Amino acid sequence: MNNILIITGPTASGKSKISMKIAQDNNGIIVNCDSKQIYREIPIITDQPNLNDTSVEHKLYGYVSVTQQYSVGLWIEDLKDEISSIIQQKKFPVITGGSGMYINSLIYGLSQIPKIEDSVRNETRRLFKTLGKKEFYALLIDKDPIAKCLHKNNSHQLLRAYEVIEQTGISIFVWKENAPREPIFKNFKLCILMPPRSEIYKKINERFINMINTSVIEEIENLLSLNIPAHFPAMKAHGVPEIIQYLQNKISIDQAIEIAQKNTRNYAKRQYTWFKHQFRNALFYESQDQLLESIKNSYVYYN
């Protein structure tokens, strides 16, 4: 029996809306698997659900500070605790979100890379800050030629690859390929919502305009006031870099909107390709109605 439902898909595909519908109808609780919606201080820019809405209970949203060093491994532990609690309550767990790394780890399990010592992690970040992206990237490639596949601007992945090769002497890609992995849960059904791209692009554009019309500028001002390092995940949430540039008088608000919309659309485009090739046993749906119809007889709900 499948008694855990996972709903994923590109950004702005309607995951949250369909998850709410399913949870409302079936005594469910929604659990977050979006790597940016975990952060407490940025609910608007990350489009977090309204946690004051008592019609459906939400878990793992806005519960981590942007100043905290958090990882997919910590999220997995938090997730397992929440799912265990939900099942004990005889309620229906609906896991939803679109972060590729979180979904991949949930479905296939975590790579068993040794824990990185604090001294190695701190030295890696010191080097990154001292050398800058370009020279740090060159240093990484010299130590780990396989890491050349990483994008030069993906600070998080560059730092992670460097600290792994520095501590273990083995490329992070070798660890990931050779280490045995097991799914976190075995009793799940994975549904991927993939509406036409034109629909998603339209929603992305509209969503960012709606954010600008709320207090998102103030939210990012407060984020900046915390003085957290630029490589921290929250600083790279969609729209954050562009609004920061606006606040620093480097671009206009119209330019910030246009660039953020374009970057988010490009991200959604990459997500389409990634989801199509990543999960062999997933079920794909073009619309929310298709997904709803498909799962009607697939679960024993706890009503």
Curated annotation (Swiss-Prot):
ATP binds at residues 9-16. Residues 34-37 are annotated as: Interaction with substrate tRNA. Substrate binds at residues 11-16. One of its GO terms (molecular function) is tRNA dimethylallyltransferase activity. One of its GO terms (biological process) is tRNA modification. Gene3D superfamilies: 1.10.20.140, P-loop containing nucleotide triphosphate hydrolases (3.40.50.300). Keywords: ATP-binding, Magnesium, Nucleotide-binding, Transferase, tRNA processing. SUPFAM superfamilies: P-loop containing nucleoside triphosphate hydrolases (SSF52540). Disulfide bonds: none annotated. The record marks 99, 121 as: Interaction with substrate tRNA. It catalyses: adenosine(37) in tRNA + dimethylallyl diphosphate = N(6)-dimethylallyladenosine(37) in tRNA + diphosphate. Pfam families: IPPT (PF01715). Catalyzes the transfer of a dimethylallyl group onto the adenine at position 37 in tRNAs that read codons beginning with uridine, leading to the formation of N6-(dimethylallyl)adenosine (i(6)A). Belongs to the IPP transferase family. HAMAP family: IPP_trans (MF_00185). Monomer. This is tRNA dimethylallyltransferase. It comes from Ehrlichia chaffeensis (strain ATCC CRL-10679 / Arkansas).
